[in-house]
Amino acid sequence: MEAVDALLSRVSAPRLTGAVPASLLADMVQAAQRAPDHAQLAPYRFLVVTGEGSSALGELMVAARLAAAPDTDAATLDKLRLKPLRAPMIIVGIASPTPHPKVPEIEQLLTAGIALQ
């Protein structure tokens, strides 16, 4: 019942500080790779963002916001720009289904969702 206990006691950490040990990150990726995947397509990708990448992500978020809502005020843009800097690491999950004759896109999206969770 250890797995059930782990799921039932899981909570999100509101603020993270310090670097994430490489071994923990490797364990997380290895666990994600155990998601059900009928044809071993691995229809997901992980992008680890740290350091300068966090600043670049903030700028990208601002650019996307301005493209969608050009009238966004400066204070909101500044807050958005700084958001990725609140954590020492961001793991971006990307669903990337590929055409397959036996595995429909919806199944690949479900696999990605399980892996990313």
Where are these regions (language model features)?
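N-terminal amphipathic, basic helical "cap/leader" segment at the start of enzyme domains
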Residues: 1-87
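Small-aliphatic-rich amphipathic alpha-helix that forms the alpha element of a beta-alpha
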Residues: 32, 91, 97-117
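Short beta-strand element of the conserved SAM-dependent methyltransferase core
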Residues: 16, 93-94
